[in-house]
Amino acid sequence: MKHIAEAHRYIDNAKEILSTKAQKEDGLYHDKKYVKMAGNNAYSGVLEALDGFFGLKKKGRKSVEWYQEELGKMDRKMLLNFRVAYDTLHLAMGYDGNLSVKVSNAGLEQAEAIIDWVEMKQGVVASN
């Protein structure tokens, strides 16, 4: 499950960027550039885990709608988690650079929940 280790590495990198470069003070980050970097890293981790789970090759990326459709067929709760991760990590952090520490923490928690779900699902599949 190389893709799971890689997904966790993306999340760890996002956390490192936020803790060392984004300058947290009073519940806010002060450097939008690093919040954007962290959001993009974390969202890439989510996609890395899902790509490995769905057996996608590295060339090209599926649309967010494709991921939503595939997750919707399998697990409605995980579909909702993915939508929150997309909105928080990709849009609010990655594009807008939302400076709220609470927003960043919520996005990272969603990312970890998705990666853990993929890891659990693959463990179940591997044991069958």
Stretches with model-predicted labels:
Residues 1-128:
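Terminal alpha-helical segments
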